[in-house]
Structures are given as C-alpha cells and as structure tokens.
Curated annotation (Swiss-Prot):
Keywords: ATP-binding, Carbohydrate metabolism, Glycogen biosynthesis, Glycogen metabolism, Nucleotide-binding, Nucleotidyltransferase, Transferase
Name the record gives this protein: Glucose-1-phosphate adenylyltransferase
Subunit structure: Homotetramer.
UniProt-listed PANTHER family: GLUCOSE-1-PHOSPHATE ADENYLYLTRANSFERASE (PTHR43523:SF2), GLUCOSE-1-PHOSPHATE ADENYLYLTRANSFERASE-RELATED (PTHR43523)
Function (record text): Involved in the biosynthesis of ADP-glucose, a building block required for the elongation reactions to produce glycogen. Catalyzes the reaction between ATP and alpha-D-glucose 1-phosphate (G1P) to produce pyrophosphate and ADP-Glc.
Keyword check for Transferase: yes
Main EC class the enzyme belongs to: transferase
Substrates-to-products reaction catalysed: alpha-D-glucose 1-phosphate + ATP + H(+) = ADP-alpha-D-glucose + diphosphate
Sequence positions that bind alpha-D-glucose 1-phosphate: 164, 179-180, 190
Pfam families xref list: Hexapep_GlmU, NTP_transferase
Entry's EC annotation: 2.7.7.27
Length: 380
C-alpha cells in the first residue's frame, strides 16, 4: 500500500561550530530548553502533522541520539502503521560508503524508502528549533503541482548572504537559486526543508549515480539540477519562529529566548506540543539559601544558590553560595559552592568546582560534556 508522505530527518551532522558540546554527541542530540534535545522539534512537528513514518539518518557519534529516540514511542510513532527507523551507513555488496552529503544519504537509503513506498518524501534537518505544520506545506505542493517545494523564510537583507537564497516569480515559482550570494536579489532563505515527488527524485539520484555525476547535496546539486531541467519548483513561505542553532552564540540566544513564557516559539501551546523522551526524576529541592527568578528549572534539580534568567536541566545542582546568571546548565552538571557562572553553557555532567568563576560577558563560554573545571572534591 502506498503511503502518502515519508519524513527523512538528516541528523548525522557533527556540528563542529558547537565545539566542546558536540565532541561526543551529534548536534541534533544536544540539549535544549532544559527538557529537550534539538531533534525533538523535527520529530514533534512530524507527529503533530500526522506523519506516521519517519527515518532518521545518522552518522557522527549516534549513540546518544539512538538512545534518545528509541522506538519512537515518545512521539507516538510506535504503532502498527507507524514507526521511526534509524538509518546509519552500512556495508553493501559494492562496499562500505559513508554518506557524502545530504542527497547522497537519501540515495544510500533508497531500499528503505521503496519499502515504505511513499508518494512524497519530506526532507528535514534535525538541528533547527521551530514549529511547523508540514501538512500545510504538502497541500501547497499539491496545489502547485510541484516536483519540489522548498520552505523559505524571509530574512533581513543584510543577513541574506549567509543563506541559500531563492529568487521567485509572482506565483512563488523558483526561477533561480543562489548559494550564499554576495549581492542577494531576494530575501527568501532556504530552511533546508524540502518536499519531493519520490519517483522523480529517485530517478534523478539513480541516474546521477550511474553516470558518476556529482549529486551529493540538495543545495549545491539537486535544486540547481531541478531548475536546469525545467522541473516545477516552488517556494513555501514560512512566517513562524525558526532558529538555526549551529553556533554557540545562536544556541545560547535561543535558550535565553525560550525562558520567557511568551516566547516566539509559543512553547506553552497545548495544541502543538513538543514531545521528548520522558525520564523519571525525583522532585526538585530548593534549599534555605535558594533564590530563583525568571528561570526554567526541570525535574531533579538541587538548588541552594542564586539562579537568575537561566535554565537548569534535569538533575543539575547549584550549591550553596553559587550564582548562575544568563546561563544554561545541562543535565547532571554541578555548580560548586561559591562558583559564579555568567553567560555560559555548561555541558551535561560537567563539574564546576567550588569558587570557580566563568564570565561570558564578552563571549559566551562553554564547558564540555563531563568536563571538570577546577579541582573536584569527593562530594562531586
């Protein structure tokens, strides 16, 4: 039986610009907002959009990501007619090949896609923070009788040169694609979200592989090929909150924006929930010296210091006399007695020893996964 649309989430990126935070995990597995990992947003969008089959394409350091996703039950994707499949590079008869790019990762998983038998494939990045109804985008794709639909976001002209820019006609048909142009003609930036008619994309990828034509990347190769071939390629304009958290500064900024109950992501909207793996933790403990304001504090935290405009993830500790300001403290991290943290991201399981000061006033500071700063005590 043919399924209407299969979602494929590209989640194999290393995220080198996140430095210490991705030395041992893939970027989509990095924590966000105290309770989530970045990939939760794409997975939740799929679940809320009524997509029942999702493939997650992994490559770099996939263990934490695989454990987090599990069988997809946290997103309601573990039913008889639904599921999440983890797609990793594998050795085939022609030899072992790593994914060489975004579209090459899709080509390497043709057998899986054919088995699902979709009419359309939705290609997503697993490293953006946003809410989006993919069903609306699919309807636009159908209405335009498009071969390819690209989700675009209007960006300030001064920032347009950082993105792949789509130049369109009056009907939103894409007539030209420019990758990070020095002099952009448009402000419609690609979000890295695509809907393809599967058979057309399949035929193009197979033909390119047989002829040894480089077709490894959607932005650099596939979209230009579609335009040159005269395929009907349309833009789908998205106007909601969308954040690329590929740098330390942007990740910190997105977390700080998320703190507000009236944040642009509309995180408290119960009609479009963001789901995540639900780990059971004990209740929070606020000690006699605890002072917490304008902050998000998740289950299992121990606080006996001062926390202002910050996020404490599951099981984080802020001990007596410690001060945390404008910072993100990830799961299991410990801020020792008298330590002072300002404008920083403290990675999972990290230990900031007693009296240590970390000041990110000039540049957001980062402490890596399980990193120890200062001299740890037996209590840590």
């Amino acid at each position: 039986m043919k399924n209407e649309m299969l979602a494929l989430i590209l989640a194999g990126g290393q995220g080198t610009r996140l430095g210490k935070l991705t030395q041992s995990i893939a970027k989509p597995a990095v924590q966000f907002g105290g309770r989530y990992r970045i990939i939760d947003f794409a997975l939740s969008n799929c679940a809320n959009s009524g997509i029942h089959n999702v493939g997650v394409v992994t490559q770099y350091q996939p263990l934490a990501l695989n454990n987090h996703i599990g069988n997809g039950s946290s997103w309601g994707l573990d039913g008889i007619n639904s599921g999440v499949s983890i797609l990793q590079p594998y050795s085939a008869s022609e030899g072992n090949r790593w994914f060489e790019g975004t579209s090459h990762a899709i080509y390497q998983n043709i057998d899986y896609i054919d088995n699902v038998n979709p009419e359309y494939v939705l290609i997503l990045s697993g490293d953006h923070i946003y809410k989006m109804d993919y069903d609306d985008m699919l309807q636009s794709h159908k209405d335009n009788n498009a071969s390819l639909t690209v989700a675009v976001l209007d960006v300030p002209l001064k920032e347009a040169s950082r993105f792949g820019i789509m130049n369109t006609d009056a009907n939103n048909r894409i007539v030209e694609f420019e990758e990070k142009p020095a002099q952009p003609k448009s402000t419609k930036a690609s979000m890295g979200i695509y809907i393809f008619d599967w058979q057309r994309l399949r035929n193009m990828l197979v033909a390119a592989e047989k002829s040894k034509v480089g077709m490894s990347d959607f932005g650099k190769n596939v979209i230009p090929n579609y335009l040159e071939s005269g395929e009907s390629v349309y833009a789908y304009e998205f106007s909601g909150y969308w954040k690329d958290v590929g740098t330390i500064e942007s990740l910190w900024e997105a977390n700080m924006e998320y703190i507000s109950p009236e944040n642009a992501l509309d995180s408290r909207n119960r009609q479009w929930k963001i789901y995540s793996r639900n780990l059971i933790s004990p209740p929070n403990f606020l000690g006699a010296n605890a002072h917490v304001e304008d902050s998000l504090v998740v289950d299992g935290c121990f606080v006996d210091g001062t926390v202002k405009h910050s996020i404490l993830s599951r099981g984080a500790q802020v001990r007596e006399g410690a001060e945390v300001l404008d910072s993100v403290i990830m799961s299991g991290a410990i801020i020792g007695q008298g330590a002072k943290i300002k404008r920083a991201i403290i990675g999972e399981g990290a230990i900031i020893s007693d009296g240590v000061e970390i000041d990110g006033t000039d540049e957001v500071q980062v402490v890596g996964y399980n990193e120890v700063v200062g001299v740890a005590t037996d209590e840590d």
